[in-house]
From Swiss-Prot:
Entry protein name: CRISPR type I-A cluster 2/Apern-associated protein Csa5-2
Domain of life where this protein originates: Archaea
Entry keyword set: Antiviral defense, Toxin
Subunit structure, interactors included: Probably oligomeric upon overexpression; does not interact with a Cas5 (Sso1441)/Cas7 (Sso1442)/crRNA complex. Forms dimer and tetramer-sized oligomers when overexpressed in the absence of CRISPR loci A-D; the oligomers are probably responsible for its toxicity in the absence of CRISPR loci A-D. Part of the aCascade ribonucleoprotein complex, minimally composed of Cas7 (formerly Csa2) and Cas5a, which binds crRNA. Other possible components of aCascade in strain P1 are Cas6b (SSO1437) and Csa5 (SSO1443), while SSO1399, Cas5b (SSO1400) and SSO1401 have sometimes been seen weakly associated.
Impact reported for residue 32 to A: In strain P2 protein is soluble upon overexpression, behaves as a monomer. No longer toxic when expressed in vivo in the absence of CRISPR loci A-D
Species whose genome carries this gene: Saccharolobus solfataricus (strain ATCC 35092 / DSM 1617 / JCM 11322 / P2)
Gene behind this protein: csa5
Its biological purpose: CRISPR (clustered regularly interspaced short palindromic repeat) is an adaptive immune system that provides protection against mobile genetic elements (viruses, transposable elements and conjugative plasmids). CRISPR clusters contain spacers, sequences complementary to antecedent mobile elements, and target invading nucleic acids. CRISPR clusters are transcribed and processed into CRISPR RNA (crRNA).
Length: 150
């Protein structure tokens, strides 16, 4: 089973998946269902649902992986390329920094929630934070650009 830091990395990638699903679908419902899940079955269903939504975005070329250069204090190496996921939804463009989970991550996460459903709550809270920060950054960019979409 995953060690502590590896568990945190898995939770982060699951949170990225949920955030991408939220931004693409423009609905926090999946994140809410995930964060409020009381059983592993409920978490598993939401994981399936969000992966289907993301798959639709990938198939439509509205979700794609990329790399971006970060200039800021939030990241250890300024000017370095970081993995990211671009999301285009209803004319809005968002970028989630980090990776989406692998199939092994999903398998490990499902084992983790068998031990404690708290991991799903943690991933849900993190996903909402990621999405809110990205949406807020997008709105600030629009106001700086005279209200145009990013």
């Amino acid at each position: 089973m995953a060690q502590k830091s590896e568990k945190e990395n898995i939770i982060g990638r699951i949170a990225n998946l949920l955030a991408v699903g939220f931004l693409y679908s423009e609905s926090p419902t999946l994140v809410d269902r995930f964060a409020n899940a009381l059983s592993k079955e409920a978490v598993t269903k939401v994981l399936y649902d969000v992966q289907r939504i993301v798959q639709m975005g990938i198939d439509r070329s509205e979700i794609a992986t990329t790399t971006i250069t970060i200039q800021g204090k939030d990241y250890p190496a300024q000017g370095k390329d970081y993995p990211a996921v671009n999301v285009n939804s209803s004319g809005a463009k968002y970028t989630v920094v980090g990776y989406l989970p692998t199939s092994q991550d999903i398998e490990d996460f499902l084992r983790m929630i068998e031990e404690d459903v708290y991991y799903a709550r943690k991933a849900g809270a993190l996903a909402m934070s990621i999405a809110n920060r990205i949406k807020l950054g997008s709105k600030q960019s629009k106001s700086e650009q005279g209200g145009e979409k990013k």
